[in-house]
Amino acid sequence: MGVPSRGRLLLGLTPYCLAAGSFLLAALAAVRAEAAEVLPAAAAAGDKQAAAEAGPQDERQSPGDYPDDVDASAMTARINDLVREGWQAQGVRPSRQATDAEWCRRVYLDLAGRIPTVAELDSFTQRRSRLKRAELVDSLLGEEYAADYTRNWKTIWTNILIGRTGGTDRQSLTSREGMMDYLEASFAANKPYDALVRELVTATGDARPDMENYNGAVNFLIEKLDEGGVQAAAKTAQIFLGMSVQCTQCHNHPFNEHRQNQFWELNAFFRQTGVDRAMMDEDEDYDYATLVDRDFAGEGKMAGDARDSVFLEQVDGQLVDRDAAGVFSAPIFYELRNGQVQVAFPAFVDGTTLAERFAEQGAEFGNSGRLSQVNRRQELAKLLVDSPSLETAAVNRMWAHFFGYGFTKPIDDIGSHNPASHPELLAELAKAFRACGFDMRQLMRWIVLSDPYALSSTAAEGNEDDDPALGRAPLFSRFYVRQMQPEQLYESLLVATQADAKLKEAERDEMKTRWLGQFNTALGNDEGTESTVFNGSIPQALMMMNGDLVERACRTDAGGFLDKVANNAELSNREKINYLYRAALSRLPGKDETNICNELLAARYGDVVQTLQDVWWAVLNSNEFILVH
């Protein structure tokens, strides 16, 4: 009868659900059942010698005992204390500590964007140092893993700043390559977060790396300046201040303190900014785009037109504004719901106006649109980096990266209307982040060496209700299971399977772009948002099970991953199966899984290559593989 078809095997695998119990056991059982149907005699008789060789293994290593004083960081200790206070206040008992292998897989995914190799896993778990977790974190944040670290974090921040679809369209002004190159250099240099924000908000220059005046930082804003820079204002507030203000361009927010005038006063900072672009005649693709600063005369008026006592006049051959007192001014206008037109000048979200700041220095042109008098984006950058909201939003976002949930939900809507789950901890972490010079690696280190991050994802008696997915405020009494991001999954598949080993660089890039593109859906709305659809649906299950990458990973070609494992004379059949589990899941198979593998090996008449292929396919398509846990 031959090898069971993937289509027939899928019949036993349709309950593909990321939150299901042991999908892996179900997958292995389906493979075993199919093999038994094809080879009933062998399944009944078995290969006793092979089954005995693949004897049962311990399901988990014993959790290590890491005393509280392993990490000397005062902030890590403070995290532990304040989170523990929350447990005590709610009468919650935390889960056990994660095993070394569990923690190792977790921290590799979060810091390096991929699972560890078998060699890396063994190196860590076999180390006897009581400081080995801190030592591994230092390695992941240091030169040894610089390539993985920068690839991971440039990807994360490219997606934050321009989305997963930003710069992928042929007619896009954004250069995705330029954005990623800029962020790669920034994370490689451990650029302070405030400096990063300042550069992103004030950048001028060409978007593409091959242009003369290239400045990759311009790609954050270059496609957000249409319609008067509405998206520039909204995304700046959302990403860097943790403020969701998009809807206030039309009206006061119905559920929080954000007001319509605040949105347009923030928007006024971007009115001196423009985009120069050139279009290729042949296919109407944009050849280049350049972000520039230019004088802003004021919005929507002609010479002699009066609104709110603001007039345009000729100065040095240009139309500029003077108010009734003769001071230069360049206003913008917005409309209330009742149709009344209002004027807006640059003012920060805390109410600080440029006119007031300049007046304190004896200057009267804070509302001017002339670059020779004021550069509004430069002034906005100063206000941003001076604002305590900057570090608060950054810490909240970083915490959510490592725990799956921030102190607020959503993470970019912070305020009195949306109280933080741990306000004291958020405030202290934010203060410390500023005090350490906005050192992002330091912030990461505090978090990943904390007690909450080291907990098991398995609920304990008494903390079953600590589940933010049910709408409850997180207590962080266990590690919350979450899906890998598509980029993490892709890199982890490559690490586990070496599926790209024989590809050229151009082929690797094409395969990655095509694979990741399956998960992205742009949402057509005025917020410029998109969705990364990776939810365990049947189409995605089919893509994983039958896609090119998994198919390539499961080949038994000479010199391939499975061929090397199957023909490794130094490994027993048991050790070969163990190797597959460690390569994908960073653990050994449990007793039930081992029994199924034994039965499958018997059903295959001891055909190790075919058995390994079936087991490998099931492991890669398991919910456990695609989860951070």
Walk through the language-model features, giving the residues of each:
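N-terminal secretory signal peptides that target proteins for export/translocation
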Residues: M1-G12
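Bacterial N-terminal signal peptides
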Residues: G12-A29
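Boundary at the C-terminal end of the N-terminal hydrophobic targeting segment
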Residues: A29, A33-A35
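Compositionally biased, proline/threonine/alanine/serine-rich low-complexity intrinsically disordered stretches
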Residues: A35-Y66
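Short, structured secondary-structure elements
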Residues: P56-G298, M302, E391-A430, M440, ...
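Electron-transfer interface patches adjacent to heme c in soluble/periplasmic c-type cytochromes
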Residues: Y66-D71, V275-L371, E379-S387, F438-M440, ...
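Carboxylate/His-rich catalytic cores and anion/metal-binding grooves
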Residues: Y193-A195, F333, R377
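Alpha-helical support elements that line or immediately flank enzyme active sites
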Residues: D386, L429-R434
